[in-house]
């Protein structure tokens, strides 16, 4: 596993990032509803899997996942497999939840599952630090979530795709820090569509 600190510093310039991060107007962001069904690849954020499993994915998201080349991150895989250790084995719904999550994981094509390398991990740490500093987050708060989001953002950039997410806030900030990052946002459907 290789990490080149000077290259990461040259690329991200964390100490030169001084302007406060402000959420952009929603009209300035890319939305799944406005995306053509056919287009560039997408990397799915964990919320896409969760919303699909809960039957709360909007039709626009379903169509993007159906027609676009979908890439997957081992970061999201870890977030999904967390339930295998977290859920109470004595709860009556645990087995069915684990079965469904297991089936979802089994459907991920191995050649489209990407793991961050040393460069991505080191760069994501810097990026998460910059995001925390410029968004005035209290020290240590949200660190793990923002670190995971930074890894996902860097992986999407590496595969030449856009992140598909409903985590509008964090990925708006990340796309301001990484101008070459494309993000396609969506809002969860409340109707329970399957």
Question: What positions do the PLM features span?
Answer:
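Acidic, glycine-rich loop-and-strand cores that form catalytic or ligand-binding grooves
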Residues: 104-108
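Glycine-rich, flexible loop segments associated with nucleotide phosphate handling
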Residues: 38-41, 95-103, 139-154
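Active-site neighborhoods of divalent-metal-dependent phosphate/nucleic-acid chemistry enzymes
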Residues: 2-6, 27-28, 82-87, 111-162
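Short, well-structured N-terminal submotif of metal-dependent ribonuclease cores
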Residues: 1-79, 83-102, 192
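Short, hinge-like loop/turn segments at secondary-structure boundaries
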Residues: 87-91, 132, 181-183
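Acidic, metal-binding active-site segment of PIN/NYN-like and related structure-specific nucleases
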Residues: 3, 146-193
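Phosphate- and divalent-cation-binding pockets in alpha/beta enzyme and binding domains
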Residues: 79, 123, 173
